[in-house]
C-alpha cells in the first residue's frame, strides 16, 4: 500500500511551495522528507515515513535521515513510520523509544484511520457499507442530487466555502486555501487528485453545490483528504454520497484501497 505523502508528485508539490525536499533510498527502505520550521529552528519531517521492509532497513533509513538533518542544520527529525514489518511482533512505541524517539506533543497526520479494501466487486463494496450509506447511495438521485468529478483547480473554491462554513460553526482550524489550491494545481494535472462535488437541482433547473471532497491518489490508494458539506442541506447527507461515489470510482480506476484519513477509535469518540 503506497502513500501519496511519500510520492514523487508530493515532492514536486512541496517544492512548489518553496520547501527543500530530500529523497533517499536504500536496500529495503526509502523516504521523502521536508525541511520545516522557521526562525525558531528547523527540523526534517518525513510524513508517514520512512518506508521500510524490516527493522534493519528502518535503522538504515533513520541513520540517513539523521545524517541529512545534520547537513541541513536541523534541530531534530520527525518521523511517522506506519509499516508493521518494521517492528514485527514488538510494541511499536517501545521499538521506536529504544532508538531515541519520543512521542510528539502534536500529531500532524491522523494517528488513526480506516482502510477500505477494494478487491471485491462493486456490489460487495456497497454491501460492506452501513445500511444508511447504502440507502442514500441508491436513492439520493430521487431528491435531485447528483455527483460530479472535477480536475479543474478553479473548482476548489466550492470546497473552500464549505470548509470555512464548517470551521466557523465547529470552531476548528482548517488547512489554508492557498495550500489546497496549490495542491490542486500540481496534483490534478498529474492525475493524482480530484474534486468530488454533490449538486442539488433547483426549481429553476439549475444545480448548486451542496458538498465537496478533495482526494489524493497514489499508485494504489485513494486518500479522502478534505471534505465538507452545506449545513443548510444537512438532512440530505450529501457528503455520504460523495464518499460512496469516490470509493467506487477508485475501484473503477484500478486502485486497491481507500484511506479515510482520520477516524476516532471506537473507544475514544472524542479523539483528536
Located regions from the model:
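A conserved beta-strand-loop-helix scaffold within acyl/acetyltransferase catalytic domains
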Residues: 1-41, 82-86, 97-108, 113-234, ...
Amino acid at each position: 500500500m503506497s502513500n501519496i505523502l511519500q510520492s514523487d508528485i508530493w515532492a514536486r508539490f512541496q517544492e512548489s511551495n518553496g520547501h527543500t525536499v530530500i529523497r533517499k533510498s536504500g536496500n529495503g527502505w526509502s523516504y521523502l522528507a521536508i525541511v520545516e520550521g522557521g526562525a525558531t529552528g528547523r527540523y526534517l519531517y518525513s510524513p508517514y515515513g520512512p518506508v521500510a521492509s524490516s527493522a534493519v532497513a528502518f535503522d538504515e533509513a533513520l541513520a540517513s535521515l539523521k545524517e541529512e538533518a545534520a547537513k541541513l542544520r536541523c534541530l531534530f527529525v520527525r518521523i511517522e513510520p506506519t509499516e508493521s514489518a518494521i517492528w514485527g511482533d514488538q510494541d511499536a512505541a517501545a521499538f521506536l523509544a529504544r532508538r531515541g524517539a519520543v512521542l510528539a506533543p502534536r500529531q500532524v497526520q491522523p494517528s488513526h484511520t480506516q482502510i477500505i479494501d477494494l478487491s471485491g466487486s462493486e456490489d460487495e463494496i456497497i454491501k460492506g457499507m452501513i445500511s444508511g450509506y447504502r440507502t442514500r447511495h441508491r436513492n439520493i438521485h430521487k431528491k435531485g442530487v447528483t455527483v460530479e468529478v472535477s480536475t479543474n483547480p478553479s473548482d476548489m473554491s466550492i470546497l473552500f466555502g464549505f470548509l470555512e462554513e464548517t470551521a466557523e460553526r465547529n470552531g476548528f482550524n482548517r488547512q489554508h486555501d492557498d495550500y489546497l489550491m496549490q495542491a490542486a494545481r500540481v496534483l490534478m494535472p498529474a492525475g493524482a487528485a480530484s474534486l468530488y462535488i454533490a449538486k442539488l437541482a433547483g426549481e429553476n433547473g439549475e444545480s448548486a453545490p451542496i458538498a465537496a471532497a478533495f482526494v489524493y491518489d497514489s499508485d494504489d490508494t485513494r486518500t479522502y483528504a478534505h471534505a465538507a458539506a452545506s449545513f443548510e442541506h444537512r438532512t440530505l447527507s450529501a457528503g455520504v454520497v460523495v464518499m460512496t461515489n469516490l470509493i467506487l470510482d477508485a475501484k473503477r480506476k484500478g486502485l486497491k484501497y481507500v484511506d479515510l484519513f482520520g477516524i476516532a477509535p471506537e473507544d475514544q469518540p472524542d479523539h483528536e
